[in-house]
Amino acid sequence: MPRIAYLGPQGTFTESALLQMISGAMVPGGDADDTAVTPVPTDSTPAGLEAVRSGAADYACVPIENSIEGSVLPTLDSLAVGAPLQIFAELTLAVSFSIVVRPDHDGDVATVAAFPVAAAQVRRWLAEHLPAAQLVPAHSNAAAAADVAGGRADAGISTALAAERYGLRSLAAGVVDEPNARTRFVLVGRPAPPPARTGADRTSVALRLPNTPGALVAAMTELSIRDIDLTRIESRPTRTELGTYVFFLDCVGHLEDDAVAEALKALHRRCEDVRYLGSWPTGTAAGAPPPSSDEATRWLTRLREGLPTPPEGGR
């Protein structure tokens, strides 16, 4: 029975994403029955990943990217250091919030408990509807609901699931400044063979480059010359000295795609370190898949065997 860490307490968007991963049979070694999985709530995203490293959990469901705020930096930073971890699945969740209060609350709202990422996504709504309220930081969206239930805040920015579990009522539901807000969650475990190639896959790596002119351009060239679609590049400081960075790259394709495999081998030669973060299915095409090398391989084989080749390299 897989143990899966997630940002708790119960009622967070991360728990909602985890439940959808379970029902979609996306957890290795599990099935679509949520009783076949043991959820392990943690206080933070890094704590969930450390639970996997220590063996206290088999996987962690963590947010990695938000359409409003961009990459979830604690997740990236935790993946870049420590024992290697690997991504096995992803799920994108539509995000909207509930402004929750205790059932007997009928006065003004002076304090609002909020997870900072959530507060950023409802900033305009708060300015319009609760301009005088003071924000009180919470560990998570569900923790904001717990703060309201415990009387530590008048209202909270939380989820419908948390409101139900803590017996709260909603002042407003479906609250979000941007109606198409989405958060992408990933399922992370210890290194293992990646899920099978589907043709709609994503591969991610973290690179440490030598401090030489053109090092980043040279690394990117290994992808471009193979027609690999790069969908994300982001840098984070190594925290060891000024001017040194880890570069996170996402591309369309799978480790089993010849073009991706060749690019990774080339990056391994060029970079000080290449941390493979996984190849996994995205469910839908996220860009142009890498070209097949089958035709070129057949052409090269004929050359090596001294056989005639069709005009124009076999095309």
UniProtKB/Swiss-Prot annotation:
Record GO terms (molecular function): prephenate dehydratase activity; protein homodimerization activity
Substrates-to-products reaction catalysed: prephenate + H(+) = 3-phenylpyruvate + CO2 + H2O
Pathway assignment: Amino-acid biosynthesis; L-phenylalanine biosynthesis; phenylpyruvate from prephenate: step 1/1
GO biological process, one term: L-phenylalanine biosynthetic process
Entries under CDD domains matching the protein: ACT_CM-PDT (cd04905), PBP2_Aa-PDT_like (cd13632)
EC number: 4.2.1.51
Residues annotated as site: Essential for activity: 183
Keywords: Amino-acid biosynthesis, Aromatic amino acid biosynthesis, Lyase, Phenylalanine biosynthesis
Annotated Prephenate dehydratase domain residues: 3-190
Assembly and oligomerization: Homodimer.
Name listed for the protein in its UniProt record: Prephenate dehydratase
Organism taxonomic ancestry: Bacteria, Bacillati, Actinomycetota, Actinomycetes, Mycobacteriales
